Amino acid sequence: MADLSLGMTAAAANASRAPRLLFIDNIRWSMIILVLSMHACDTYSPFGNWYYVDRQKTDLGTALFFGLYQSFLQAFFMAALFFIAGYFAAAAYDRKGFAPFVRDRFLRLGVPTLLFMLVIGPLTQYFLSWTWGSGGFAHQWFKHIRDGEWLSETGPMWFCAALLVFSIVYGLIRRSGRSEPRISPGDDRASSLWLAGFVIVMAASTFLVRIGIDEGASVLNVHPGDFPQYVLMFAAGALGCRGNWMSGLPERFCIRFGTIALVGSVPLIAVLILFGGGLQGETQHYSGGFNWVSAGKCLWEALVCVGMGLLMLAVYRRHFDRQGPVSKWLSDNAFGVYLIHPPVLIGAAILLHTLAWNAIAKALLLTALAAVGSFAASAFVLRKSPLRAIV
């Protein structure tokens, strides 16, 4: 990635007019299904935070599986969505300019977030997760609004709230006359140096932010220690639009260095598990602080993030750059699923409460039920309502 030039480029203009990248749509709905999987795991695993939990006593093997799987997902799936969002934000700004760009982001990100905070979230908490007090829904809802509790109740829509902030900041930067440098795919050596530097910056910035922040801290319903990764991936997406990375990064490069990153992450996570305290139930160092465990985990997350991103790009671009009726339907409903899945998933979890299955098996079943129910709710309710324009 050795070719750098400043200013508006022909590549960016071409990206704005390029045919739709169907493999990106397929990555997007795949990541949404992983969101459902994560929240299903939050329901049954010893880790995570969710509206409704149905935890049972788990053995070490089950706890280790959940810890590894959830940490693995957390390391890359939302970051991938931020990268995609940054990529298309750059192209959207090129087409629209500042005011229409920001107005469109408010409509497509702000309105659904407010809908969740004011309607879907309160209904879910009162009628399904039972996390609100007594006194009737209307009473609790007005109390929720009056006391300002709704401002911190973004739920899973924290992603859209954060993305709205990122988009506005990006728009202001572009309005000031600055633009991303064009970093086009070059020789493998130059590209590998850029990637190595990106991994190091991501790991170091995440580690530094997590040093002094409490494990339970939250901004927009997400831990501040995760923001460095999200900001960097959004910025990388905008740079990727300038350099046409989605189509231009060579497949062999993506596979080679994606594999190197993931293979390198395996001994690192093994050391973190064996010697970081997790097997003894001492997990506090994994979340932050000035210690080698937190530093190692931040590096592991960065390796997984970049490695999975490169491999997904190569695999989806080669094998899934097309859509039939089913994949088109899944793609059309992906955002609606993200918006509506909490009450659907929690309702399914309540129905499964008496099922005497292993926690892993129940999480798999809950994922499947939530996916079917959420896609159906999006297709036959949300997309047949006035909300169709924004979901």
Go through the PLM ranges and name each one.
Residues 2-391:
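Alpha-helical transmembrane segments and their immediate juxtamembrane cytosolic regions
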